Structure formats: structure tokens, C-alpha cells
């Protein structure tokens, strides 16, 4: 669900109203997204501006080339949402021109290779290779196009979602610890009555309060787009996963 929320946020920003309505309608009817999100590359993870996947017109055909990695559901989703540099309209500036494309996974030239992971087995990842994939102009998402500036802000949403998962795991661990402290007995009494156990549970509760505060503050900053957005998200990202 967290992955779906993030993917829908991306579509909402880069698609026009009609394109987003089609994706949302299908999601409401089926409960699953139809596409995999392909942004990260082997040499362009956090350094997204080093993206090498590109589109270029060759003999009047629009061609996509490149490689994406850590693509969720990359082997199974019928469509792929790909971020690529538009080589046809390169211009001087801080940010290279970037566009998003929603294309069928079974296009000629698209290959998927599974990534073996230790955890998160419910969400399979894959590496995707695009080898001279011919694109139709209809595959391009035609919503508001602010390129990397827009993408960087959306990644802040993803960091909030990830830290929310960490907070959820911490709360689940707290509930398990409290349940065990109430059910386990030693010397004829519940171990939760021992001062050392009480202190451990108190420290856990303090950490959860701190995590909640930082998460909600960062989420509010992202929603409002305030000047402290990047700082709030960075502090949350630094503290919450480690505390969990």
C-alpha cells in the first residue's frame, strides 16, 4: 500500500487529469496498480541528475535506451513508468530535461531481470534494460513538467512513507513487548512489574513519541511546502529508521 501511494503521487504530478483518472479508476476497480516505477539507475540512485536513460529521435522514430534498477514489480507489471532524459531538447541549465513515459512492458527491446533480496519479499524488485525501444508519443505523460525539481520534491513524499513504515514496526514491537511483559512471570509476578523492565518499556515509548513527532512534522512540511521541508525530512530520515 505504501508503494502504491508513492506511485500514485508520481502519476498525479506528471500526468494530466485524464491520464491520472484512468489510472485511479483501474486502481479502484482492481486494488492494484498497473505499472512499475523506474527511476533509479546503477549510477544514479540518490544522484538522480546523473540519470543516463534517455530518449532520442532516430530516423523519425522516438527511441528509448538505458537501464533502471530496483524497479518494484518490474517483472510483472504490464506497464512501466520510466523517467528519461530528453536528448532532443537539451539546453544549458542546472537540470537536464526529463520526461516520464508510461509504456507497455512487452514492447520489443524491454528486458527484466529479478533482483534477489534479503527482505521485503512481498515486493519483488527487478533491473530493467531498454535497448532501442521504439516509443509512441502517446506513451508520454503530459501533465505539469518541471523535471528534476518536481521529482526531488516527490521523493520527499517517499521518504515520509518509508519512515512511516519504520514507525509502524516500532509500535508493533512495543505492543509485543508489553504483551510479553504482562504474560511472562518470574518469581510469581509479571516481569512488567520489575523496575528494569518498566524502564526499558518507558524508553521504548519515549522513542516512539520522538519518532511520531518528527514524522508528523516532516509530513506537515511536505504537505505545506514550507521553507523547513528539506530540513524536517532530513532529520526524520536520520532519526526514525535508526530509532525503530
Write out the residue ranges for each language-model feature.
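Alpha-helical interface subdomain recognition
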Residues: 14-17, 57-62, 127-129, 153-244
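Hydrophobic, small-residue-rich alpha-helical packing segments that form membrane-like cores
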Residues: 45-47, 62, 103
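Internal helix-loop-helix
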Residues: 1-31, 72-79, 222
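Glycine-rich phosphate/pyrophosphate-binding beta-alpha loops
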Residues: 44, 69-75, 157-161
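A short, Trp-centered hydrophobic/proline-enriched beta-strand micro-motif
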Residues: 30-40
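Flexible, small-/acidic-enriched active-site or ligand-binding loops
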Residues: 50, 106-136
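Long, acidic (Asp/Glu-rich), low-complexity accessory segments flanking structured domains
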Residues: 131-149
Amino acid at each position: 500500500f505504501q508503494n502504491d501511494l508513492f506511485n500514485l503521487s508520481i502519476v498525479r504530478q506528471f500526468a494530466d487529469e485524464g491520464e491520472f483518472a484512468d489510472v485511479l479508476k483501474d486502481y479502484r476497480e482492481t486494488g492494484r496498480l498497473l505499472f512499475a516505477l523506474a527511476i533509479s539507475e546503477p549510477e544514479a540512485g540518490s544522484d538522480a541528475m546523473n540519470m543516463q536513460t534517455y530518449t532520442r529521435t532516430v530516423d523519425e522514430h522516438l527511441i528509448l535506451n538505458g537501464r533502471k534498477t530496483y524497479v518494484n514489480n518490474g517483472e510483472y507489471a504490464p506497464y512501466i513508468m520510466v523517467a528519461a532524459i530528453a536528448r532532443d531538447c537539451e539546453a544549458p541549465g542546472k537540470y537536464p530535461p526529463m520526461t516520464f513515459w508510461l509504456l507497455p512492458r512487452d514492447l520489443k527491446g524491454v528486458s527484466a531481470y529479478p533482483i534477489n533480496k534479503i527482505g521485503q519479499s512481498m515486493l519483488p524488485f527487478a533491473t530493467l534494460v531498454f535497448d532501442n525501444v521504439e516509443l509512441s508519443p502517446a506513451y508520454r505523460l503530459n501533465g505539469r513538467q518541471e523535471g528534476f525539481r518536481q521529482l526531488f520534491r516527490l521523493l520527499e513524499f517517499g521518504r515520509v512513507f518509508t519512515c512511516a513504515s519504520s514507525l509502524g514496526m516500532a509500535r508493533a514491537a512495543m505492543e509485543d513487548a508489553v504483551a510479553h511483559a504482562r504474560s511472562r512471570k518470574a518469581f510469581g509476578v509479571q516481569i512488567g512489574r520489575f523496575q528494569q523492565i518498566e524502564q526499558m518499556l518507558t524508553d521504548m515509548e519515549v522513542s516512539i513519541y520522538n519518532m511520531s513527532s518528527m514524522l508528523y512534522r516532516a509530513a506537515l512540511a511536505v504537505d505545506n511546502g514550507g521553507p523547513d521541508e528539506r530540513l524536517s525530512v532530513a532529520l526524520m530520515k536520520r532519526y526514525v529508521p535508526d530509532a525503530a
